[in-house]
């Protein structure tokens, strides 16, 4: 009986998070009311307050949910044992497809500057991303695919490049957004990669762009974490 109750409670919690993610993905945080979320979730305020004390707490839960998912997805890429630079490129396309296909991913980038800034969460998340990518960048330098650069500087540049493209791009035009990601890589590649390896990585980027376009086209945006994975 206890297990059944726990499963129902967890299902309700996920239902609320999905509805909140969809709302936060579409509109600014301050424009979303609890009634909007509860109407979409088809639940009462009592059900929500059992799990979340406030809209702020719910927004933090959406962020935590996506960060856990993204962390696991990036670790899965690292575990594939591709070269360091191939992995860095794959991480960029993974993030792009997540942002295109998942409400939770879209919501997080909307929420972090608003909800995360005051508590230092935004800084922590970005610093953690830079640190994680620095480890992969260090491997890429050791493998000779990236010229001798400070791995943390490379990681920070890649994070800034993606966030800038994300801010300026249109996720509702997936192919255009992914082509912009491709062009971003093409622009920075000559400053990172030895001349004798540029052609290989240009071809790798083209293949990854085509794969990402295909994946994004097959997975319309969804809050459900099972849809685009």
Residue ranges and their predicted role:
Residues 130-131, 135-138, 142, 171-229:
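C-terminal peripheral helix-coil segments that are non-catalytic and often amphipathic
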Residues 61, 68, 72-101, 105, ...:
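Hydrophobic alpha-helical connector segments
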Residues 1-27, 31-43, 56-60:
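Basic, helix-initiating cap at the start of DNA-binding domains
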Residues 46:
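Key DNA-contact positions within bacterial/archaeal DNA-binding proteins
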Residues 71, 116-143, 149-159:
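Amphipathic alpha-helical packing segments from all-alpha helical-bundle domains
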Residues 86-111, 117-131, 190, 194:
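Helical hydrophobic small-molecule/effector-binding pocket
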Residues 15, 86-94, 153-160, 179-183, ...:
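Amphipathic alpha-helical interaction segments
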């Amino acid at each position: 009986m206890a297990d059944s109750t726990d499963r129902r409670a967890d299902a309700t919690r996920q239902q609320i998070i999905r509805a909140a993610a969809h709302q936060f993905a579409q509109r600014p945080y301050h424009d979303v009311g609890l009634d909007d979320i509860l109407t979409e979730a088809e639940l009462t305020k009592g059900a929500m307050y059992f799990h979340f004390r406030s809209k702020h707490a719910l927004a933090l839960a959406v962020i935590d949910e996506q960060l856990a998912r993204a962390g696991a997805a990036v670790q899965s890429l690292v575990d594939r044992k591709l070269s360091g630079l191939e992995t860095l490129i794959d991480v960029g396309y993974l993030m792009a497809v997540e942002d295109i296909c998942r409400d939770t991913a879209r919501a997080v980038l909307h929420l972090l500057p608003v909800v995360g800034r005051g508590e230092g969460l935004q800084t922590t998340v970005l610093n953690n991303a830079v640190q994680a990518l620095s480890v992969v960048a260090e491997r890429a330098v050791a493998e000779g695919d990236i010229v001798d650069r400070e791995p943390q500087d490379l990681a920070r540049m890649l994070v800034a490049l993606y966030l800038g493209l994300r801010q300026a791009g249109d996720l509702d035009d997936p192919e255009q957004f992914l082509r912009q990601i491709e062009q971003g890589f093409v622009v920075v590649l000559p400053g990172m990669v030895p001349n004798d390896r540029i052609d290989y990585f240009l071809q790798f980027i083209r293949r990854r762009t085509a794969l990402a376009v295909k994946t994004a086209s097959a997975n319309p945006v969804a809050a459900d974490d099972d849809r685009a994975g």
